[in-house]
């Protein structure tokens, strides 16, 4: 979550600006996407927001107080990720190209940007529809999902990435659909310093509270918000997805991100 000294817009500016100017220069990084929680509440601020409430269930009342945004870091190998925070040889100096020590610190603004230290998790990514980005901002929605224990992990995954995703992939105006399933693989040890707040008792409790509400993030990119509301609430699609979600999900709710 953002530092209490920052407004949400100031957090966005600080993360997108200064912090990401170093994060995108981490050694061997292949991709970096920052998602900041939108100022618009998808369940309240649109003409058809009431529809979102109809397909959402078991969202914690304080969920938005637990996150301000999340970055997605892509590396070829785990070893590249764990050694990424090193000085980068990409700064012009009086004697030619120099190492920039601030890249190793990712700008050194953690205590001013965040409330406590951030935490990170590994995901298994399944690309259902590759993201096609036109030259303008897309309408991006995250569906936070928690699986119930009705099905085995293998069977649930086959249903989620099979019939459920296939139905969603046919929505008009859809520019991308990606499923991210959180794993238990440790990507924090040796990336953050041992004394970081995220390893303290308070930090662990904060992280576990956030995790208990979801284990899957489904990312939707739409050409605009009108396509989301018209396509996602198509009667035939809605009938199918509602049956699936009521049977196999413990919780499901939606958030717009920039």
How would you name each of these model-derived features?
Residues 1-258:
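Macromolecular interaction modules
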């Amino acid at each position: 979550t953002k530092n209490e000294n920052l407004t949400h817009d100031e957090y966005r500016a600080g993360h997108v600006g200064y912090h990401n100017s170093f994060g995108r220069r981490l050694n061997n990084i292949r991709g970096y996407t920052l998602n900041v929680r939108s100022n618009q509440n998808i369940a309240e601020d649109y003409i058809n927001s009431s529809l979102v409430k109809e397909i959402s269930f078991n969202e914690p009342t304080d969920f938005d107080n637990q996150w301000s945004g999340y970055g997605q870091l892509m590396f070829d190998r785990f070893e590249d990720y764990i050694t990424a925070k090193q000085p980068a040889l990409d700064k012009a100096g009086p004697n030619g190209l120099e190492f920039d020590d601030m890249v190793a610190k990712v700008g050194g603004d953690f205590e001013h940007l965040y409330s406590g230290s951030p935490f990170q998790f590994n995901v298994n990514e399944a690309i259902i529809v590759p993201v096609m980005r036109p030259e303008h901002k897309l309408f991006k929605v995250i569906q936070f999902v928690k699986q119930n224990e009705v099905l085995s992990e293998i069977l649930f995954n086959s249903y989620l990435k099979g019939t459920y995703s296939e139905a969603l992939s046919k929505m008009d105006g859809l520019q991308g659909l990606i499923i991210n399933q959180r794993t238990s693989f440790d990507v924090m040890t040796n990336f953050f310093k041992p004394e970081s707040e995220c390893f303290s008792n308070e930090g662990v409790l904060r992280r576990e509270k956030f995790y208990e509400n979801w284990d899957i993030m489904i990312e939707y990119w739409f050409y605009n918000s009108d396509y989301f509301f018209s396509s996602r609430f198509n009667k035939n699609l809605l009938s199918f997805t509602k049956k699936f979600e009521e049977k196999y999900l413990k919780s499901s709710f939606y958030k717009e991100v920039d």
